Amino acid sequence: MEETNNSSEKGFLLLGFSDQPQLERFLFAIILYFYVLSLLGNTALILVCCLDSRLHTPMYFFLSNLSCVDICFTTSVAPQLLVTMNKKDKTMSYGGCVAQLYVAMGLGSSECILLAVMAYDRYAAVCRPLRYIAIMHPRFCASLAGGAWLSGLITSLIQCSLTVQLPLCGHRTLDHIFCEVPVLIKLACVDTTFNEAELFVASVVFLIVPVLLILVSYGFITQAVLRIKSAAGRQKAFGTCSSHLVVVIIFYGTIIFMYLQPANRRSKNQGKFVSLFYTIVTPLLNPIIYTLRNKDVKGALRTLILGSAAGQSHKD
């Protein structure tokens, strides 16, 4: 997106759902509601994991990292989207678009890797229980989490830097809800074969490879769980892993639809709704799924709330 396009002066026109005013008003309320719940849910999950010593384990360390990524990821999109939907002028500044491009892609890529790391953690816990503490050493866990954040940053710098260099020849209308790499590549007025190939490679590395690793991990996990003699033990193991698997299917499925499916095979509105799903809906699902399906988290949350209430009444 070179400055000769005047994009840096005029910004980009985000059409979103402006051609359907009633739908846009409805989505505004839904997105605002989901965003607030996502912030509250993920923040509560981070606080519980930090404040309750019983949750100072690798699983909850990665879960708190996931919640942190989700808060940042949805915040990189939702506020701008709400502002744009609530005003007549749908223009987004050039700098805002570029910043959103880098941040959203970096955080989304980090979450892709982090979910695979969490699958490995579950594999180690279920299939290597006697060596679990030795395998998932705190330094190793920190390295895995740091690697997930760093890998997202690196791929974002590479992919987005290539994208912003594309000449747009004055084109500044984005028929989408926010600035995203596939949409900006389509706006370019030159051959984008290299950019599309690079995006495809990045998508394979950050989507297909993690999904395959997760499936392999859960294959071993399923075998190990079926060998557990205790019905209660099997139920607990399946409950923990199924929660993670639900998040994985929803998150990867929607992003694969957006990034690996040819654009001519989906309608413009399909792409918009799919983008809403992995930027707004999925970050809300994580705290709900992990809280409602996890007795440890529910117990810790209950203790935290009751403790705060007791402390407040004692002061009074």
Swiss-Prot record:
The lineage of its organism: Eukaryota, Metazoa, Chordata, Craniata, Vertebrata. It is found in: Cell membrane. Signal peptide: none annotated. The chain crosses the membrane at residues 26-49, 58-79, 101-120, 140-158, 196-219, 237-259, 273-292. Disulfide bonds join 97-189. It is a multi-pass membrane protein. GO terms for biological process: detection of chemical stimulus involved in sensory perception of smell. The keyword Cell membrane applies. InterPro entries: GPCR_Rhodpsn, GPCR_Rhodpsn_7TM, Olfact_rcpt. Keywords: Cell membrane, Disulfide bond, G-protein coupled receptor, Glycoprotein, Membrane, Olfaction, Receptor, Sensory transduction, Transducer, Transmembrane, Transmembrane helix. Odorant receptor. GO terms for cellular component: plasma membrane. Residues 1-25, 80-100, 159-195, 260-272 are extracellular. Glycans are attached at residues 5-6. This is Olfactory receptor 2G6. Belongs to the G-protein coupled receptor 1 family. Residues 50-57, 121-139, 220-236, 293-316 are cytoplasmic. PROSITE patterns: G_PROTEIN_RECEP_F1_1, G_PROTEIN_RECEP_F1_2. PANTHER family: OLFACTORY RECEPTOR. One of its GO terms (molecular function) is olfactory receptor activity. It comes from Homo sapiens (Human). Its main location: membrane.
